[in-house]
């Protein structure tokens, strides 16, 4: 890879061709290595330490395959394979582009140090002198279909942002031409789509697997993934106008920051300094290595950015133009990023330097970020008015006055902040929807559909989160088979308790029925004991509808034969998933359409 970096950086066509061949060879070797490691899992070859620590002969076959990326060594190897594959794609599709060699030289530079990290701190091919009879099994929390696909999606998001970073670096050397911008938008869109999908999958998994009944806990590892996502969101928006030399340097800075935040996240998670329900592997030596990589990439990329500041000089957007609103949007996103960054890292700093354990709870994040989310929604609304103002100033001013009057009435009424927020978001949702329908009816232009749906889905998502926060409720009860309890207009009944044996765990299966009016739902919740290690996990029972979910977690058994049960009624969950999916699809459609597919 070091040779490939040198060949690409030489900008000599003969050497570039040789570098491309080395890149393909590197990808082939990595693919064989990954296939070989997967084969060891499928063969229960516990002579390999990595296989021993993450599998067993009782583990179902499909989880033996996903166990390959379940821990640090395999997951990083997969990420390296994906980065190498992206370099091959760059060679294949953009061979004639003047920026391709610099882009692949940057990616080769990154890949070289990733390989060093893999070899010296995270080698998954180490073996025992004597092969054990069985492994210690895969972490039970990872024995889940959704968690089998979540890590590869997350790593793909990180890797794709490394590619956008390499394109940004290439632009600083070779100039940001039309074709480079086109490909930057494509890679940035796919990167954002992939990372957003990973966050959504993680939220769904947390909701049904971890048992607290929530989809986002402001857990440190959740926050670490959110940091590059926020920067990536700002970066994607900044690409809209930067081709016109507006906010060009801002776009470059955001592209660099997004990549650096993904590296920083890897350092924090792998260093072992976080306590998190999502942390499954840690090693301080890995953290030191990754911190060194972060420092190397940060100093080199930011140093290049400042050295090219004259070439990146761009125009400042006009006051109250769409570009100006876009800049405000970016600033709000970065303020949110700063809040999450400080709330996540401050406890780490106090523990490292002052030996004091400090915990920052969800209230800190919610209280500071919620007003900023409302600000973002207000900017969505302002953009709609700004577009109309240019077309028909008089009617638009009347509409602004009417909407402002409604907002004023809402604010002077005696409503709680959460209810006020709900009404505000609902009103914005109605206005955006009406605006979208009018535009589509008049223009019949489906090309704007992805933008409309994107903003609508964000507002709908905010509305669903507020509904969930305001109206969801739960209760802890003790029930024996046949007992029932009334809660919030619903009747919960424990129908039966049975013990069943599975391939690699024994489970207590509790069957419930929940009735409301004439409707009855049947739910199953489990308490599993895994045969290797004796780890106990709870499997939630969930019945979903568009309005609300019934959520049941089976707890411990008491001496009198009764069981502790947490029964929750969660509102708006399905709306959260639906709005997130709409957001993803709108981004995917826009990305593909812009690239001409």
Task: Describe each PLM feature range.
Residues 15-16, 39-73, 123-151, 201-224, ...:
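Membrane-interface interhelical loops and short amphipathic "cap" helices
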